[in-house]
């Protein structure tokens, strides 16, 4: 096992400010492809600062509910904001399970190989599930968690 623990960080709502595009998934029909295509988000200073601080003594792993087909766009965004761009774990394109389940599954696999020092996520349901599973978790509370984003994560399995 490597000596440095992992810092596992969500993207949307932690380092990327998605508020400007939430209207695309608020009403029906939900415009998911446009929502993801417009992911030229402003960075969230609190999240970016935390990631840079954690990178001093942790290996950063990104764990996002964004679908795999948005990998290049997400990696480009991370690079533009001078954040580590790999490893980046993403939701399989056709996996619409709640974020709390997909993230728990991915984290259990990571935990088999490395110590997980901290997980940072903005979704209270994800935080509760991971805490119950014994992961050290910090709720990213620098933005109020949106009910639109919560529905996307829980009911639609999209972010």
Name what the model sees in each region:
Residues 2, 57, 110-116:
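Glycine-rich phosphate-binding loop signature in dinucleotide/nucleotide-binding domains
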Residues 107, 113-154:
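Acidic, Mg2+-coordinating phosphoryl-transfer loop and its flanking beta/alpha structural elements
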Residues 2-97:
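Alpha-helical substrate-recognition element adjacent to the catalytic core
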Residues 77, 102-103, 152-156:
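Short low-complexity, flexible loop/linker segments enriched in glycine and/or proline
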């Amino acid at each position: 096992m490597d000596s440095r623990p992992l810092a596992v960080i969500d993207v949307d709502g932690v380092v990327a400010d998605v508020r400007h595009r939430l209207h695309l998934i608020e009403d029906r029909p939900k415009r998911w492809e446009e929502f993801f295509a417009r992911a030229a988000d402003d960075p969230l200073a609190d999240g970016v600062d935390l990631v840079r601080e954690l990178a001093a003594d942790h290996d950063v792993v990104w764990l996002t509910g964004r679908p795999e087909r948005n990998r290049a766009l997400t990696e480009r965004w991370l690079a533009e904001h001078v954040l580590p761009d790999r490893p980046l774990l993403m939701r399989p394109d056709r996996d619409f399970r709640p974020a709390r389940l997909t993230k728990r599954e991915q984290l259990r696999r990571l935990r088999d190989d490395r110590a997980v020092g901290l997980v940072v996520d903005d979704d209270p349901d994800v935080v509760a599930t991971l805490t119950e599973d014994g992961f050290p978790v910090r709720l990213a509370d620098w933005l109020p968690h949106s009910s639109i984003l919560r529905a996307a994560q829980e009911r639609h399995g999209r972010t």
